[in-house]
C-alpha cells in the first residue's frame, strides 16, 4: 500500500521527538523553526505553553500583564507557591525553557491591545489566545487579519469550554461571531462572555485545570495542522469546537462569515523600513514617504492618539497616549479639578507641533506598521529596525 508520506532512517532514531516523528505527516523541523505567540498566561495559557514546549516549538512569545496569585496554583502547571507575586509571563517563560532546552521563550509584560506592533504579529506562524475578555480578542483578530496570520481562541468556564480557529480568507473571523450584546459589553469594558455579573464583580473566575487542558490541547492540535498546511489536514478554520465537560458531549459549529466585517482588512503590501519607534521622528518618516509617494502624502495610524487635554479654565496638558488608554484621572484638570476635553489625531499631515517626537513618544509601539496615504491609496511601512530589540534572546 502506497502512502503520501515516506519515513526515513532518521525517523526511527531515539531522541526527544522520536515518537512524534512516527506520525506520517509530522515535520519536526517546522516546529523547531516556528514562532508562536501566546496571549494570556493563566489556566489556558499554562497548558498552551506546556504543550508548545513539549512539542519543541522553536520560539514562544508570551504576553500577560498580571502577577501570579495563590488562586492560580490550582490551575497552572508552570507556577509554584514561591512564584506568587511574580509576573506570570516571566515565570512561564522560565519554566518552558527548563522543560525543554531546545525552546526559546520570552516574556512581554504588555497590553496586547496597544503595546504590540503589527510587525510582531507578522512574524508569527500562529497566535494562540488564553484570554478572558472580548476587547483583547477583537484586537488580536484585527491585528492578525491585517498581516494575514491565523489565530486560535480558547475559553473555559467550570467544566465547559470552546476552541475557535480563525484564518484570513477561510471562513468567519472573530468579529463575524460577535453579537450586539458582545459589542455592548466591549463598550462597557466587561470581562469574559462566560461569567455572571456577580462573578465578574467579585473577581471570581470559575475554571478548572481539567477543562483548560482539554481546550488548550485542541488549540495546539489545530495549530499543528496549520503548520502542516500542505498536508491537506482538516482544520477548524472559521469554526468552533464546543466541549461540555459535565456530559462529555462535544460538537463543531460553523460560523457565518460577514462580507462587510471591518476586521477583514488586510494590508496587501508592507515595505520594511530602517525606522525605529524609539529613534526615528515623525518628521523623518513623513519626509521619507513624501519622497516616495508625493508631497501631499500623510502618515496614517491605526489608532486615535490623544494629544492635548483642555479645560474651560484655560489649563492645558500634554497627553500623547492612545485614546484607548485614557483614564479618568488623566482628564482631571490639575488646576480646578474639572473634567477636561481632549484633542486627538490618527494621521500626520505635516503642520503638527509635535513632529519631532518619535512614534513611541506618542503611543505607537515597537515594530509597528503605519500607512503612507495619498488620496485613496495607502502604502504600509514597518519599523523594521525594532526587530532586533523585540526578538532579542529569541
Where are these regions (language model features)?
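Glycine-rich phosphate-binding loop and adjoining beta1-alpha1-beta2 segment
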Residues: 4-5, 57-100
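ADP-ribose/adenylate-binding Rossmann-like module
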Residues: 126-166
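The feature captures the short pre-catalytic strand/loop hairpin that immediately precedes
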Residues: 171-210
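Conserved anion/nucleotide-ligand pocket segment
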Residues: 126, 196-237
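Hydrophobic/small residue at the entry helix of a nucleotide-binding pocket
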Residues: 44
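A structured beta-alpha segment of the ubiquitous adenosine-cofactor-binding alpha/beta core
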Residues: 85-138
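N-terminal charged helix/coil linker that caps or initiates catalytic domains
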Residues: 1-37, 70, 323-329, 343-394
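Cys/His-rich short segments
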Residues: 255-353
